[in-house]
Amino acid sequence: MEFPFITEHKTFGDDRGNFSPSPLYMKHDQRLDKHWVQVNTSISPLIYTIRGLHFQLEPFEQAKYLKVVSGKIFQFVMCVDKTHFDFGKTYVFEVDKDHAVMVPRGYANGLITMEPNTVIQYFVDSPYSPQHEKSMLYSSVEEFDTFVKNYTENPHLSEKDRDGFLWEDYKKTL
């Protein structure tokens, strides 16, 4: 069984700017050695922007490797696989440009930006499928909700994320 984890993803800089390699073949760590099929970029101009919690259902479940290109986030990863003994457990990671987080299949992923103009790049091992995508309301997950309330009363959310289902309702469907 796989679990989420944070790893170094170094950015190198000099007077010309920065360079950050993102190898598609990550043999240096077998946990990262996936068949990545798509690379996505997310740009959040506003601080306290919330994305997620998102996941996809079979047969389009996704493992994700998320790297912050610029800015800083707190990432929330929650096991939504009822067959996993980690079911319902939430992990929280502070992620900046020198780190990345591996999110295995069977986990929902959400984040809050802690700086304006945050750019995130993420690799996925299955293509995006709107018909299989699920969005869970962040405030229905106690750790995520408490964290957000410590920083802001007015986070920025998309309509889709604002209309996400509740964690308690999801558990009843299993």
Residue ranges and their predicted role:
Residues I120:
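Compact nucleic-acid interaction/catalytic patches
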Residues M1-E94, N117, S126-L174:
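Non-catalytic, conserved peripheral segments adjacent to functional cores
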Residues E94-N117:
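Conserved metal-binding segment of the jelly-roll/cupin
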